[in-house]
């Protein structure tokens, strides 16, 4: 069976990572969370004084980005990969609201996207990968054999994020999360470099009212169709 590249793009908190991880595990592919890479750069920026309030010291980050290396290693307890920033596990740190509120302006910077896209393309050279993000099917792997674009209503996505934070024992109000979701949608769709959009050849999946099992079944079906071609 031929190996392919699978690109899953879509809005924040619409379950891209969960479905990408599950699909990768099911078909024996490597999963790469591109969103986690931008979150890791954001965390680095927060921890290294690159933010002054909401203002980014772009010159300082431009100098630092050359030495920022993001990798993924399997976590035997979860069965899924954790994110490492320069060799340090930051999986839990990058999922906080503090990082969520600052990740969109960081990921909108052209030199940050250029650096991350280069790392992502290096990871996917041999195919056999599932990568999710905002511009995987349009910019990172425009020739991916299977492209999915995922969407859901802002309210449903905010509720999912709220439930996820609550399960991890982290605080956050639903209203604050909903506002963050809407802000990120706007920034992601209107940035100058690689804005969020559905690739012309991507399949659309609105999972507002789908269970995880229904999603899995649909994704498996699409994967099967492509690898048999």
UniProtKB/Swiss-Prot annotation:
- Record's keyword terms, sorted: ATP-binding, Cytoplasm, Kinase, Nucleotide-binding, Transferase
The EC number(s) given in the record are 2.7.4.25
The protein's matches in InterPro entries, at most eight in alphabetical order, are given as: Cytidylate_kin, Cytidylate_kinase_dom, P-loop_NTPase
Q: Give the matching SUPFAM superfamilies.
A: P-loop containing nucleoside triphosphate hydrolases
The compartments listed are:
Cytoplasm
Would the keyword Transmembrane turn up in this protein's UniProt record?
no
Enzyme class per UniProt? transferase
User: What biological process terms from GO does the record include?
Assistant: nucleobase-containing small molecule interconversion; pyrimidine nucleotide metabolic process
State where it is primarily located: cytoplasm
Q: Which residues bind ATP?
A: 10-18
Transmembrane region(s): none
| Record's GO cellular component terms | cytosol
Give the reaction(s) catalysed: CMP + ATP = CDP + ADP; dCMP + ATP = dCDP + ADP
Pfam name, any one: Cytidylate_kin
GO molecular-function annotation terms? Answer: (d)CMP kinase activity; ATP binding; CMP kinase activity; dCMP kinase activity
Q: Which family does it belong to?
A: Belongs to the cytidylate kinase family. Type 1 subfamily.
**Which PANTHER family is this protein grouped with?**
CYTIDYLATE KINASE, CYTIDYLATE KINASE/PANTOATE-BETA-ALANINE LIGASE
Name of the molecule in the record: Cytidylate kinase
What is the species of this protein?
A: Bacteroides thetaiotaomicron (strain ATCC 29148 / DSM 2079 / JCM 5827 / CCUG 10774 / NCTC 10582 / VPI-5482 / E50)
């Amino acid at each position: 069976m031929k190996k392919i590249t699978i690109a899953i793009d879509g809005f924040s908190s619409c379950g891209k990572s969960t479905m990408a991880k599950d699909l990768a595990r099911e078909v024996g592919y490597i999963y790469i969370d591109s969103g986690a890479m931008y979150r890791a750069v954001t965390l680095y920026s927060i921890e290294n004084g690159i933010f002054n309030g909401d203002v980014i010291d772009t010159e300082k980050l431009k100098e630092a980005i050359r030495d920022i290396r993001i990798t993924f290693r399997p976590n035997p307890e979860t069965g899924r990969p954790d994110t490492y920033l320069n060799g340090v596990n930051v999986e839990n740190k990058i999922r906080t609201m503090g990082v969520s509120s600052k990740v969109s302006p960081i990921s909108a910077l052209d030199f940050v996207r250029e650096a991350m896209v280069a790392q992502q393309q290096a990871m996917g050279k041999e195919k056999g990968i599932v990568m999710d993000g905002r511009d995987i099917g349009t910019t990172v792997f425009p020739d991916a054999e299977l492209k999915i674009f995922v969407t859901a209503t802002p309210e449903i996505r905010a509720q999912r994020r709220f439930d996820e934070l609550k399960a991890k024992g982290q605080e956050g109000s639903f209203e604050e999360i909903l506002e963050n979701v809407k802000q990120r949608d706007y920034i992601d769709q209107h940035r100058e470099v690689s804005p969020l959009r559905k690739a012309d050849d991507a399949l659309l999946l609105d999972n507002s009212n789908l269970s995880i099992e229904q999603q899995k079944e649909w994704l498996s079906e699409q994967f099967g169709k492509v690898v048999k071609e």
